[in-house]
Amino acid sequence: MFKVFKKEIAGRVLEVEVGKLAQLSNGSCLLKYGQTAVLVNACASKSPREGIDFFPLSVDYEEKMYAAGKIPGGFIKREGRPSENAILTSRLIDRPIRPLFPDGYRNDVQIIATVLSVDIDCTPDIVAMLGSSIALSISDIPFQGPTASVHVGLVDGKLLINPTSDEREHSSLDLVVSGTKDAVMMIEAGANEVTEAQMLEAILFAHEEIKNIISFIEEIAAEVGKEKQEVVTLEINEDFETEVRAYAKTRISEAIRTVEKLERNAKIELANEETINYFYEKYQEELNLKQIHTILDSILKEETRNLILYDKKRPDDRQHDEIRPISCEVDLLPKTHGSGLFTRGQTQVLSIVTLGAIGDVQILDGLGKEESKRYMHHYNFPPYSVGETKMLRSPGRREIGHGALAERALEPMIPSQDDFPYAIRVVSEVLASNGSSSQASVCGSTLSLLDAGVPLKDMVAGIAMGLVKEGDAVAILSDIQGMEDHLGDMDFKVAGTAKGITAIQMDIKIKGIDEPILKDALEQARVGRLYILDKMKEAISSPRPELSPYAPRMLKMKIHPDKIREVIGSGGKTINKIIEDTGVKIDIENDGTIFIAAQTQEAGELALSIINNIVREPEIGDIFKGKVIKLMNFGAFVEILPGKEGLVHISNLAHERVNKVEDVLAVGDEIDVKVIEIDQQGKVSLSRKALLPKDNDKKQDDPQKA
């Protein structure tokens, strides 16, 4: 049955069509917002996947180039691997809905959001996030939503829901919030040093709109929703669970209290092994390994959370707001342009900066208008960082997401192209990880950029906050380690300067958090961030005054846009000759700005001089050393600048009469000439005799008398 539902959001109508497209999916809907259209499908397998202890949810956000009226580039001319934006949007869709499936649900669930049409004023990511919630809510998949999502901007002190393209350009906040009616589930933000109070206000502002949208989704589900499937979960024998807990609880509790990670893991593993062996000897083949592993995992989680909530201690013996020991180093790698090593507890990140020509920027050819990215951050998480072995492959979604978060944190502090005309790439290599590696890469990036001499507007640091919540008992944790992330209820990453926040990412494993927890977490993160910044300043507190000797030297000049073709030359002949002769890189912008990247200052200045000569307009009185390129019976044509020539009339060759031009000059001769006239067509008249002394003229120029 085909139905259309409509609701106005931020002055534009959201239209939801159900029952027309993709009717074999468990749940399907077409959303139209402005001229943006996204088709979202949700499907689930008929039975649980065997032998897994996680929920197999996959989310794919498909960018179709036809949605923007484009044909894909490349030889194949069809969509290939998902873009970085598509991967980040897939993660945005995934994160708020994942906690809202029943515990123990092991059926494969797949969400596919296909962008069919794009309106730059109505971003398709938010539409896809809403569509995923609607598709799940109307399906028979056991989803405990709905959720809703909005984009929030801050323009001239005013908060805006789902800002337009122009408003986003002028916004000091780029915030995405997802939540249920009761609480916030997910936050993703980039900002230009907004305060904690402003950020909290924006999040709560978003949640009010989310509540309205959820009421709309509930109406849709009530009218066209299917009956939900029954969830098949593993049943635990209560008597057996009591027996296992009595044997293993004390052993696991003692193991958890081991401060060092590897030793703690070994003791937990030993406690589990002893428990399994004990019950295997008792029950032999009747022992259900799946049940005992599930019970042991629940004991580990409960004992860890009890330690934090009621003993007010953490597994590594820290206080709730205590940050692990920090060390910072710079200038570790002699041939790189800048490097920084940030170590926090057992998490260690080495960040390396490379400075390049403006032409090295990354071109982002997506569904919106073509853009470029001058500052790039790439995050690598090799298996050895957690003491494991694994095949090395291209970066996964997690690595791309963490890299984008650290990039967003630093981007507002990167100097403008006018102030620092370089493309900047930072690579963060995670050498060891026990939690908060993405925020360690924020700190490492700051250290390495300052070491490279990049004039950051301010230093940026990041911290990962955690949460453990049971009823009214709440513990907010600063600088969480891996175990606290895995067994806790929240991963709340906050990065910023001493003045304010530049990036936030929050994921919740429970059904949301309320305003008091958000407020306390933001304030505790601010205190921690300031502490980390002070530690970083002990290693380096300002950019180095000089760039690395191995970094390219950048020179900048401005020419009239009409002169660009002269610098490039026919088929690029002129510019390629300059590059070949000097070894520089040259980038020319449409407004006539030219950037020259050279390995040495001398090479850059030579290229600059050549370009100056190309675009220089001769004026009356200018003196040049020119080259004779053509002889005529009435005079000689002399090249005075690259691509520019003038005529020395035979009467201006010498003070004495010259019968034949060939008597005085030959093609290829280099002579000094003076500009004596420029006519209305721009033709240049030159004089040689104006620069010759009369006394010596005959001796120098009359071959018959010489």
Swiss-Prot record:
It catalyses: RNA(n+1) + phosphate = RNA(n) + a ribonucleoside 5'-diphosphate. PROSITE patterns: KH_TYPE_1, S1. The keyword Cytoplasm applies. It is an enzyme of class 2 (transferase). InterPro entries: ExoRNase_PH_dom1 (IPR001247), ExoRNase_PH_dom2 (IPR015847), ExoRNase_PH_dom2_sf (IPR036345), KH_dom (IPR004087), KH_dom_type_1 (IPR004088), KH_dom_type_1_sf (IPR036612), NA-bd_OB-fold (IPR012340), PNPase (IPR012162). Coiled coil: none annotated. Its main location: cytoplasm. It is found in: Cytoplasm. Mg(2+) binds at D485, D491. Residues 552-611 form the KH domain. Involved in mRNA degradation. Catalyzes the phosphorolysis of single-stranded polyribonucleotides processively in the 3'- to 5'-direction. Belongs to the polyribonucleotide nucleotidyltransferase family. This is Polyribonucleotide nucleotidyltransferase. It comes from Alkaliphilus oremlandii (strain OhILAs). The gene is pnp.
